[in-house]
Amino acid sequence: MAGGAFIDESGHGGDYEGRVTAFVMITCIVAAMGGLLFGYDIGISGGVISMEDFLTKFFPDVLRQMQNKRGRETEYCKYDNELLTLFTSSLYLAALFASFLASTITRLFGRKVSMVIGSLAFLSGALLNGLAINLEMLIIGRLFLGVGVGFANQSVPLYLSEMAPAKIRGALNIGFQLAITIGILAANIVNYVTPKLQNGIGWRLSLGLAGVPAVMMLVGCFFLPDTPNSILERGNKEKAKEMLQKIRGTMEVEHEFNELCNACEAAKKVKHPWTNIMQARYRPQLTFCTFIPFFQQLTGINVIMFYAPVLFKTIGFGNDASLISAVITGLVNVLSTIVSIYSVDKFGRRALFLQGGFQMIVTQIAVGSMIGWKFGFNGEGNLSGVDADIILALICLYVAGFAWSWGPLGWLVPSEICPLEIRSAGQSLNVSVNMFFTFFIGQFFLTMLCHMKFGLFYFFAGMVLIMTIFIYFLLPETKGVPIEEMGKVWKEHRYWGKYSNNDDGDDVDDDAYF
């Protein structure tokens, strides 16, 4: 594969002692529950904004506008309302800014402290939303939820990457994405049940139940140790070595511990990680911590996850059918993520990126063509039962392609490629870019659908093609490489090597590769 610098596992990961212990498995499973926070919020919003009780309470003008338009708008534009989409997407702006603060706290006080803060903030937001009596209370609750998501998404992937042995780091890190998909599925099921409840109980229950994953994570945090990397970063060598011995299940950890110490010494020399990550020698990390989350959102996946009920209604599904279809796609998302857990450390990151990208391109084009055939440019048309089943099957194939590629790898790769001295900054950059474009897609998707019509699916297919080419030429394989030896991967890559071997941070010729 062009541009792929493959590293033999025996040359890196095989010389560390230890085994996969029950202790490290349990701690990683508990930590991964942080993904439930993000997943539940992604899945719940679309159902809540479709409840008339909720709209009557907080957005009566929007409800009247929608009722007055019935029968006069095209299928593509029937749900286009910026105020409603702002309710969904505003959380992610709060998460964006919180991720920068989380970077500093994670570095100074440890990954565990950031997870506790994230849990408390998310729990506070869930309580405020579930008990909201006015729009101000609702928005403040959304901001607290955003802070919780920002802290959890910044700290949990780092925690998992640092705790896991190199040979199964991918599988354990994907536990975070699996928890996200379980959260989405749980929200889809809640959305199916709660609209049947009267007197405003439905939307309150939907929003308030976000507190359940927050409590689970908060309780779990009290039983989690901090990572050896983080303990060492804060100056306690003896405790760090003891923790490394515990999670590796052996006293023979000298080689790995020495690598951690070397990385820590390098990190101590870095006083301003946000300045350092801009240096030439960190150009690969800067590139992937920026472009992977950017591309992840432009796969179009959150179109399905945010607005699944609305999207299915838009393309002709009935109310119950749209909610059931959202549950089905959520289940496919979970099962396909489980597939990635078993395949990521066997086939590698690049193989999953490329296969998943191809699958998403084909299915997006097929969905766009099907909708264009049935509704045309004017949005007038309808779907037969067979047509609806075909579109649902295509969307499920698309979700599966994402769930074993860009979904988990979008969190795994940025969290494992950065050296300790810029790791918190790199992960914070990853989260902030992800949150910004999550906000962008959430805010403007319904408007884009109204104006671009079925061509929107072609747009996302084109973006997936671009990102697949990007991965093919520029991403080296990181399977089985110990996290503190990741620098060797970049030095051996035919493009990134000129940056990673440039210890002085001088500018280099970008055209040399071409």
Swiss-Prot record:
**What controls how active this protein is?**
Inhibited by uncouplers such as 2,4-dinitrophenol and carbonyl cyanide-m-chlorophenyl-hydrazone.
UniProt GO MF annotations: monosaccharide transmembrane transporter activity; symporter activity
Q: Which UniProt keywords apply?
A: Cell membrane, Membrane, Sugar transport, Symport, Transmembrane, Transmembrane helix, Transport
- The residue ranges for the Extracellular side of the membrane come to 41-82, 134-137, 191-204, 312-320, 372-389, 450-453
Give TM regions. Answer: 20-40, 83-103, 113-133, 138-158, 170-190, 205-225, 291-311, 321-341, 351-371, 390-410, 429-449, 454-474
Expression by tissue: Specifically expressed in germinating pollen and pollen tube (at protein level).
| Topology in the lipid bilayer | Multi-pass membrane protein
Instruction: Fetch the InterPro entries from UniProt.
Output: MFS_dom (IPR020846), MFS_STP/MST-like_plant (IPR044778), MFS_sugar_transport-like (IPR005828), MFS_trans_sf (IPR036259), STP/PLT_plant (IPR045262), Sugar/inositol_transpt (IPR003663), Sugar_transporter_CS (IPR005829)
Q: How does activity depend on pH?
A: Optimum pH is 5.5.
The record's subcellular location field reads:
Cell membrane
Cite the ranges annotated as topological domain Cytoplasmic. Answer: 1-19, 104-112, 159-169, 226-290, 342-350, 411-428, 475-514
Offer one Pfam family short name for this entry: Sugar_tr
GO cellular component terms, alphabetically, are:
plasma membrane; pollen tube
Name the family the entry cites.
Answer: Belongs to the major facilitator superfamily. Sugar transporter (TC 2.A.1.1) family.
Question: What NCBIfam families does the database record attribute to this sequence?
Answer: SP (TIGR00879)
Role, per record: Mediates an active uptake of hexoses, probably by sugar/hydrogen symport. Can transport glucose, galactose, mannose, xylose and 3-O-methylglucose, but not fructose and ribose.
Q: Protein name, please?
A: Sugar transport protein 11
Native organism taxonomy: Eukaryota, Viridiplantae, Streptophyta, Embryophyta, Tracheophyta
The gene it comes from is STP11
